[in-house]
């Protein structure tokens, strides 16, 4: 046996063929071992076992007389390229992306951020079945805002939904400095905490042998709306009519909204189906309107009298002028302001109209009548002129012109002219003018005009979708936050602002915020700060002090912290007003913070700022603060850019502060004192204006 096996493969193969099989068949002829039956060669192997072409034997070259194949196989082996060096054939991107996972096409005039946003949502966030809806052409703006583009995508799970929305908000903030808002988004830790609590409740219930109530716990909402806001500020042409349906004002720019769903929630809501139906209805409505206008016959309008063109019309190609006779021989012309009509066109019931122009305080009724005498001007401009003139009058005269109250319409020349102009206005213009009158009267502390009537007029304008500008909206808030006058409720009621008035002001601010008005600015927060400084009742508010003697937990301090936390855009004019309010409210730290921010925000301190600084310290009368203020800031005046000269009213206020800090400063300076206050006192005396 050993001799047979030692003969190599030939002996083994013969043995296998000769062995009978117990199963009725012989063994396979091919051995299970990979035995190479070829003889040993010193040359390379003819065929590679790993090569795909090894199954076909190489044929000798017929031109070779000796039939030598060694040379041919050597050449083929040298030309063989291994698999790891072969270049892969590039696969078309359209084959890689299925039909349900493709980036939608961009609409016309799309913002520059849209293709980048779609690419990020598709590739980085991994949302599937993206759908883009262009809602900019809708006649009725959607609740999410006008000129909106909506992107709808599907997330793979609830966790993927929350993570994608969070990453998208962070990407928009960091890359494009936007302020997106994700409605329905749970924070990174909030979702983990809720899931952990839910699992804990399930374990406790299982131990007790009960089941957990499967009600909506707010975790698996399956829908997150990421509103990126206005991504491109493009001017929108002002429409002729402001009577539009929908929410908010007509704003410029395009806003982008990304709607993220889970697969089940998207099928349940079918948001794209709802919006596609709305877009189709709007398209049909527009088509019907176009067809109606095209089918309507064109009416030909001709003048009743012959038209005679002037020579200037032939030269410049202008439109022909009509020879219609204007009433009372009135002629139109181009003027910088409205032209006064003749005395024959005025109402003779007011005696003050024939007395000429006298804008002195003694003849304010004549000036009021003069401002309303321009009958050829637009009535809205006339009411604005009347209100502007009223705001320039002293308080006593303004209260006299406003009459007895809101029901009074003809007791004064101002009211007669104002309501006469209202009678010739449209309903929208009259309602807005009435709101302006109420704001002016309430700000002047007129007892006949209530804040409830102003709120009613404001809600009426909103109900009829009348246009109220942002400036008028802030003016309404300012009127709502006007404190009660000193004569109402006795001397102790000075500066009292009831809680009901604050609530009305906050409701107005909430409405302005919902329609898109920017209320996070220093002007609004200055109004809130002044309102917080007033007590809500006659007894006042108890001031809580800590062990150091400083006040804490005051409403004004909370508003100041809110201003600092929100990092509101710096407004130099409103910042100076807020500084004065903070100083008079004993918030000295807030005052100095804003004072130091003036030059850092591109608003250098001026002579008026230093005049305000020293005047406030002189009115305060605190010896220590007056000394520190003069010693620190009087020398810095010459170091400002540009330098502040030591002259004018600022010199008087500095001297008052020095007298508060050191009453005997004049004697000390005369005696030759070299103290800091004495040197500043001498400089002020040298630059003080001479008294005649």
Curated annotation (Swiss-Prot):
UniProt name for this protein: ATPase synthesis protein 25, mitochondrial
Record region (Disordered): 44-83, 286-314, 338-373
Membrane topology label: Peripheral membrane protein
Organism the protein comes from: Neosartorya fischeri (strain ATCC 1020 / DSM 3700 / CBS 544.65 / FGSC A1164 / JCM 1740 / NRRL 181 / WB 181) (Aspergillus fischerianus)
Alphabetical GO biological process terms: mitochondrial gene expression; mRNA stabilization
Domain of life: Eukaryota
Keywords assigned by UniProt, alphabetized: Membrane, Mitochondrion, Mitochondrion inner membrane, Transit peptide
Gene3D superfamilies assigned to the protein according to its UniProt record, in alphabetical order: Beta Polymerase, domain 2 (3.30.460.10)
Ranges of compositional bias, category Acidic residues: 347-357
Biased composition (Basic and acidic residues): 292-302
Function: Probable mitochondrial mRNA stabilization factor.
Record family assignment: Belongs to the ATP25 family.
Annotated InterPro entries: Atp25, NT_sf
Location relative to the cell: Mitochondrion inner membrane
Gene Ontology CC: mitochondrial inner membrane
């Amino acid at each position: 046996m050993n001799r047979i096996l030692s003969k190599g493969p030939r002996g083994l193969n013969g043995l296998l063929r000769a062995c009978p099989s117990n199963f009725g068949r012989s063994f396979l002829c091919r051995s299970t071992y990979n035995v190479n039956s070829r003889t040993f060669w010193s040359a390379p192997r003819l065929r590679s076992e790993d090569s795909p072409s090894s199954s076909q034997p190489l044929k000798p070259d017929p031109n070779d007389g000796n039939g030598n194949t060694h040379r041919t196989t050597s050449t083929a082996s040298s030309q063989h390229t291994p698999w790891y060096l072969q270049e892969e054939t590039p696969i078309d991107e359209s084959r890689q992306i299925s039909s349900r996972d493709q980036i939608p096409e961009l609409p016309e005039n799309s913002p520059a951020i849209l293709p980048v946003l779609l690419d990020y949502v598709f590739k980085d966030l991994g949302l599937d079945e993206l759908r883009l809806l262009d809602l900019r052409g809708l006649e009725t703006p959607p609740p999410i805002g006008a000129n909106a583009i909506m992107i709808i995508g599907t997330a793979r799970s609830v966790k993927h939904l929350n993570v994608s929305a969070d990453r998208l908000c962070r990407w928009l903030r960091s890359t494009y400095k936007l302020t997106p808002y994700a409605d329905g988004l749970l924070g990174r830790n909030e979702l983990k905490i809720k899931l952990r609590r839910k699992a804990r409740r399930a374990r406790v219930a299982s131990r007790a042998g009960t089941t957990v109530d499967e009600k909506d716990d707010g975790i698996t909402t399956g829908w997150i709306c990421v509103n990126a806001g206005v991504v491109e500020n493009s001017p929108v042409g002002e429409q002729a009519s402001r009577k539009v349906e929908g929410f908010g004002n007509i704003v410029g720019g395009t806003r982008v909204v990304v709607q993220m769903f889970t697969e089940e929630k998207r099928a349940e809501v079918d948001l794209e189906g709802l919006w596609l139906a709305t877009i189709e209805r709007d398209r049909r409505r527009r088509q019907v309107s176009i067809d109606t206008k095209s089918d309507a016959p064109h009416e030909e309008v001709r003048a009743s009298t012959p038209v005679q063109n002037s020579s200037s019309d032939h030269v410049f190609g202008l439109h022909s002028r009509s020879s219609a006779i204007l009433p009372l021989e009135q002629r139109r012309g181009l003027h910088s302001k409205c032209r006064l009509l003749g005395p024959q066109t005025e109402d003779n019931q007011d005696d003050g109209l024939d007395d000429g122009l006298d804008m002195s305080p003694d003849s304010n009724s004549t000036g009021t009548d003069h401002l309303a005498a321009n009958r050829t001007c637009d009535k809205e401009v006339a009411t604005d002129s009347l209100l502007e003139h009223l705001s320039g009058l002293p308080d006593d005269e303004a209260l006299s012109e406003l009459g007895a109250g809101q029901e009074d319409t003809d007791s004064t020349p101002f009211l007669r002219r104002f309501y006469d102009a209202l009678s010739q206005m449209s309903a929208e213009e009259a309602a807005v003018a009435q709101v302006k009158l109420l704001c002016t009267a309430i700000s002047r502390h007129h007892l006949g005009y209530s804040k409830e009537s102003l709120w009613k007029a404001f809600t009426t304008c909103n109900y009829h979708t009348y246009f109220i500008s942002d400036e008028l909206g802030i003016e309404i808030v300012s009127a709502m936050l006007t404190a009660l006058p000193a004569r109402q409720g006795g001397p102790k009621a000075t500066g009292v602002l009831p809680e009901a008035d604050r609530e009305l002001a906050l409701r107005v601010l909430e409405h302005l915020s919902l329609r898109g008005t920017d209320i996070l600015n220093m002007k609004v927060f200055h109004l809130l700060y002044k309102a917080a400084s007033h007590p809500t009742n006659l007894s006042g508010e108890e001031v809580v002090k800590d062990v150091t003697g400083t006040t804490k937990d005051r409403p004004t301090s909370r508003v100041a912290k809110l201003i600092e936390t929100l990092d509101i855009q710096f407004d130099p004019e409103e910042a100076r007003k807020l500084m004065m309010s903070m100083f008079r409210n004993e918030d000295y730290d807030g005052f100095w913070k804003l004072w130091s921010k003036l030059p850092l925000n591109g608003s250098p301190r001026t002579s008026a700022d230093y005049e305000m600084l020293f005047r406030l310290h002189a009115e305060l009368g605190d010896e220590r603060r007056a000394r520190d203020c003069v010693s620190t800031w009087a020398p810095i005046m010459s170091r400002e850019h540009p330098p502040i000269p030591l002259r004018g009213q600022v010199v008087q206020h500095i001297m008052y502060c020095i007298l508060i800090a050191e009453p005997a400063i004049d004697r000390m300076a005369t005696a030759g004192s070299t103290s800091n206050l004495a040197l500043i006192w001498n400089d002020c005396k040298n630059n003080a204006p001479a008294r005649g």
